[in-house]
From Swiss-Prot:
Ni(2+) 2 binds at K219, H248, H274. Ni(2+) 1 binds at H136, H138, K219, D362. Gene3D superfamilies: Metal-dependent hydrolases, Urease, subunit C, domain 1. The active site is at H322 (proton donor). Pathway: Nitrogen metabolism; urea degradation; CO(2) and NH(3) from urea (urease route): step 1/1. The keyword Metal-binding applies. It is found in: Cytoplasm. One of its GO terms (cellular component) is cytoplasm. InterPro entries: Amidohydro-rel (IPR006680), Metal-dep_hydrolase_composite (IPR011059), Metal_Hydrolase (IPR032466), Urease_alpha_N_dom (IPR011612), Urease_alpha_subunit (IPR050112), Urease_AS (IPR017950), Urease_asu (IPR005848), Urease_asu_c (IPR017951). It comes from the Bacteria. This is Urease subunit alpha.
Amino acid sequence: MPYKISRAAYAGMFGPTTGDKVRLADTELFIEIEKDFTTYGEEVKFGGGKVIRDGMGQSQVTRADGAVDTVITNAVIVDHSGIYKADIGLKNGRIAAIGKAGNPDMQPGVNIIVGPGTEAIAGEGKIVTAGGMDSHIHFIAPQQIEEALMSGMTCMLGGGTGPAHGTLATTCTPGPWHIARMIEAADAFPMNLAFAGKGNASLPGALTEMVLAGATSLKLHEDWGTTPGAIDCCLSVADDYDVQVMIHTDTLNESGFVEDTIGAIKGRTIHAFHTEGAGGGHAPDIIKICGQPNVIPSSTNPTRPYTVNTIAEHLDMLMVCHHLSPSIPEDIAFAESRIRKETIAAEDILHDIGAFSIISSDSQAMGRVGEVAIRTWQTADKMKRQRGRLKEEKGDNDNFRVRRYIAKYTINPAIAHGLSHEIGSVEIGKRADLVLWNPAFFGVKPDMVLLGGSIAAAPMGDPNASIPTPQPVHYRPMFASYGKSLTNSSVTFVSQASLDAGLKGRLGVAKELVAVKNTRGGISKASMIHNDLTPEIEVDPETYEVRANGELLTCEPATVLPMAQRYFLF
């Protein structure tokens, strides 16, 4: 007779299984395990007296004959594709298999072979997600990269050269010389990195040379002059070389209004940064473009979610970030035109219905690089409390809402920027850039961050202690953050044209250079998983009220948020 144990005892030993529910941090979001790939009674687990021992759950199979490098056991996978439990096998820095791990010589249904050369990571009671991607980075300070890594981000895309004033305001690495220096610098950091060139030009020559120098994308920013002519020129170069274009439109409406920008885009695919407008863009109605089928709209995290402090904070941030002076009335008017509680409130709802597709940081330039995940889940929690269950939900859980929101900082930015063949989801064949979370700390403080299958960061106690847990416990770089392991565990993304032109040999960098692809006509708003809605947006020019398909979008600011002070006492 098989031995029977209670669900509680089973969850305590092997983690939750099909039908069990897990609360995410201190939010009101509850996930339910949809499927468990294990064979009950044949689970593998590492430890004294446990299963992964020689002749038991560990086989004699060599790596050459199919054993994996690492197995993550009994993990709850939270991904855009579903919420399920499985073992994960890693090999050659990639996800080799998802399913049932063990010894095929004595266990049924094994598709992940554990051998003497296999390392074990205990996923029991843990959540595994794909590493996050932050697609709106001002590379102002290299220290941002460690901050982002420790928050669960494994890819950063943006522009800059350090604390130059152009970088403080705009996400552009201008010109081939600066792009080369940034690609060289990338070898020092445990992070997948990608750099954007400056897209503001009326003739294509300077833009073309930036793409050939390795830019994965081109950024149009109003501080450099986002005119209709510059928009058209930039998109034409992008179409020629298969790179994405990101746009920050003309707040002052000097060279045209939102309709003129839409006209200049001419139906071509484009990623619209901070589409609500507080981060910049046609005042007061840039938010309209989230209804365009060719526009991929995103948010930056300072407006996520709308709270009682959002408006006051933004005015001061904006003055600093855009080199404005509080003693100049025109500068104050410029700042005030961008900060509108009505459009920020509407942004919450547009995220919840899947009309906004991506959340990013805007690091040190009106955004916090370590809070992409936190702000995403705070928005999801606020919307559940204010709007209730989504109509797409099945069963007594929040699975669909969770899948919608995790897509905003994993798969969708990866698709938008031509990286989804490598990153963005927990999927066989993709890079093993994975994050383990204790559910109580989900989205706030990871348990472990893997880059290319190696541990790059984790909380760790006193290195002189007799065990790993004594205080002070804080995040520390792990072995994938050092030496050649660093350059073999992460990559730098570049354009295909730059690879074809011999960029790697020319720069002599150690990291693998990987080309972006399918950023233009092959994708659109419809490609944004769980976030592809294109409502018709109207903005009242006097009251700033926002309507989607005729429905007024409004909500109250939050006075209390989850995932906040409770988690940051020390």
